[in-house]
Amino acid sequence: VEYSETPQLLSDFVDSIEYIRLSDQPLIPDTRKVRLSEDVQGNLYLDFNEIYKYTPRGKYLKSLFKQGQGPGEIHALFIPGIYNKAENYVLVKNHNAPYNKYTLEGNFIKTVDAQIDSTNIEVLTYWKNYEIFRYEKDIILQKGEAANLDSAYFCQVKDKTGKIIYRLPNHHFDIKATSPGRGTIVLLGGVIDYGEINRNLFWIRPNYVDTVYSTSDWTDVRPYYIIQRNNRAADYAWSVRMKVGDITREDAEREQLCNVYALKSGLLFNYLFNPKQQGAGFCPANGKSKTISRLFKNDIDSYCPSIDLWQAIAYKTLYQKEDYLYLLIDAFKFFEEGAKSPFPDLTEESNPVLVKLKLK
């Protein structure tokens, strides 16, 4: 794969584009800080320091919770909300506090403890009423101590009764790194990417692991894509060393295959050559990716000439549901040279436009 200033084509994996005009009030902040979600009725959720709820056509409805330090309030949203659409609720992590549980109508249900003794429970996501989670714990590695901070399992899965039904094994747990002894390490592991290819197929991939796994019900988890990296790219052993600070100058200069999104037609990914040459690419299923670029040319319609998928992937602001990818595009992008507005009342100062990419 090579870096190119020439945008790739959106039509390589996108079939059509739908635009949704969001209410102009309340104001939506920097799109790099907003996470998207959708419930079973098609209502939309924009998640940043608050969670705003919208109708399927973009009309603002309400904020899901009150800000404050009282019962059922959130004084500082720590991470994006974690939505269980099958049960119609969202977990919201209060800063330095347990999760608050709300219905998707905004009613406070209860506080959910996220700790067992000194071990924290991090809920990653819900899918079909399964809870995907992992444990995290602060430890201090002594100088010269060998460790793999991902532990023996990357994550675990509970069913709706709370029974653990699956653990995603770390087949590389024998790979260890030697700690230089520089202080506290968070036993958290690396980034885990995941999403929904369709309503009956979920995918998951721990960063720097070459396998994208898929499942329909967690009784059968199997490889969906096998990633073939070039020899210059960082591998899993590199990531193990990086997490404990056991790195060399050569390690720091390695190319990196970063976040991915598994699609039915292939793999959307971010790639880093160096700070000046990084971008997004698309690798077709059973094929090979040739280039990465900062932008993808919109060769499907005439509204927005290019879309910055590199930034959307890097900030994890893409939302994947069934055969769609959702993202926000700033309104002023539709007034740049070569663009045109999809709505007659849109202005450069309007809230961002929600874009739904229908995937091939």
Where are the regions a protein language model picked out?
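Conserved blade-ending motifs and adjacent loop-strand segments that build the rim/top face
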Residues: 224-250, 287-322
